[in-house]
Regions:
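N-terminal binding-site loop/beta-alpha segment at the start of enzyme catalytic domains
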Residues: 1-8
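Helix C-cap/helix->beta junction micro-motif
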Residues: 2, 75-76, 125, 184
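Conserved, mostly hydrophobic/aromatic
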Residues: 6, 39, 48, 61, ...
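Glycine-rich beta-alpha junction loops
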Residues: 10-12, 87, 107-111, 133-140, ...
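Glycine/proline-rich, positively charged
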Residues: 15-113, 117
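Conserved short secondary-structure transition element at the edge of the structured enzyme core
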Residues: 73, 134, 163-201
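Glycine-enriched alpha-helix->loop->beta-strand junction motifs that scaffold or abut catalytic
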Residues: 77, 95-102, 121-130, 200-201
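Aromatic-lined glycan-binding groove of carbohydrate-active enzymes
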Residues: 114-154, 187
Length: 201
């Protein structure tokens, strides 16, 4: 166990959240305590190394969530905590109560806006930045050309990135990635990941 790092999440209590149901968000103290115990049982471990708040619950103040994280750390149930897709003000307020170890946001070759916002914030506060979807949901693998037919319910069918206009807009970037991949005898996904791990923080 000491050689394994386990990260998991709390805050989304029902999959209907992904269909627009915000009532499926619950980061109340009572719910978090139930969620962490359920995670520990499912994972077959007595502590979690990194416990992310999966999405911000508008009904829960950041200070309250951070206090609960502090409680879990003191109880030995988690070692550290992080937040996913949280605004800067939320991060600052929560961090002031209980140190946030990691934030997770969308970041890739085609989503670089955090370089001007969250990267400086992480450096200022000493927080690790974790990329969500470093391959842009598979787009940077170059396996989904224009005209690809997706199964019913596949979210890629609704994303501009995977539609003709998105593919056309990023054509020069993908051509460059493919050129580097050819030189290095690597896949485009490997090039995208190699680029990303050179970034900071």
């Amino acid at each position: 166990r000491k050689e394994t790092v386990i990260a998991t999440k709390f805050g989304i209590v029902d999959e209907s959240f992904f269909m627009g149901n915000e009532d499926a968000l619950n980061s109340s103290r009572t719910s978090i305590l139930q969620q962490v115990d359920a995670s520990l049982k499912r994972l077959g471990t007595d502590y979690i190394d990194l416990y992310y708040q999966h999405r911000i619950d508008p009904k829960a103040e950041p200070e309250e969530v951070a206090e609960t994280m502090q409680e879990l750390i003191k109880a030995g149930k988690i070692r550290s905590w992080g937040v996913s897709f949280a605004p800067e003000d939320y991060i600052r307020r929560a961090h002031a109560v209980c140190k946030i170890s990691a934030i997770e946001n969308m970041y890739s070759f085609v989503a670089r806006q955090d370089e001007e916002t969250y990267f400086p914030l992480c450096e200022e506060l000493g927080i690790t930045y974790v990329s969500a979807c470093p391959l842009a949901k598979g787009y940077l693998s170059n396996r989904y050309p224009a005209g690809t037919q997706y199964r019913k319910g596949d979210w890629r069918a609704e994303m501009n990135l995977f539609k003709k206009e998105g593919i056309d807009a990023n054509r020069n970037l993908m051509d460059l990635i493919m050129e580097f991949a050819g030189r290095k005898r690597a896949t485009p996904a490997q090039i995208a990941l190699a680029w990303e791990i050179t970034k900071k923080p």
